[in-house]
């Protein structure tokens, strides 16, 4: 895992198309701004896991 330190207003770039900017820090929360192409999905981890569970559930129902 790559670990980076950024300050408010600083940006990191992933590949050629994804920019992540630190917008603010309040206590233990960090606000991030993410610019990515429309074909790149961006989700919080808990939402992504829920989507994956729903896909697995749909796949298992179709297999029956």
From Swiss-Prot:
Subcellular location: Cytoplasm
Keyword RNA-binding tagged: yes
Gene Ontology cellular component terms for the protein in this record: cytosol
Record GO biological process: mRNA catabolic process; negative regulation of translational initiation; positive regulation of translational initiation; regulation of carbohydrate metabolic process
Matching Gene3D superfamilies: Translational regulator CsrA
UniProt cross-references to Pfam families, sorted A to Z: CsrA (PF02599)
Residue stretches in coiled coil: none
GO molecular function annotation: mRNA 5'-UTR binding
Keyword annotations: Activator, Cytoplasm, Repressor, RNA-binding, Translation regulation
InterPro entries per UniProt: CsrA, CsrA_sf
Quaternary data: Homodimer; the beta-strands of each monomer intercalate to form a hydrophobic core, while the alpha-helices form wings that extend away from the core.
Family designation: Belongs to the CsrA/RsmA family.
Known role: A key translational regulator that binds mRNA to regulate translation initiation and/or mRNA stability. Mediates global changes in gene expression, shifting from rapid growth to stress survival by linking envelope stress, the stringent response and the catabolite repression systems. Usually binds in the 5'-UTR; binding at or near the Shine-Dalgarno sequence prevents ribosome-binding, repressing translation, binding elsewhere in the 5'-UTR can activate translation and/or stabilize the mRNA. Its function is antagonized by small RNA(s).
Protein's name in the database: Translational regulator CsrA
Organism expressing this protein natively: Legionella pneumophila (strain Corby)
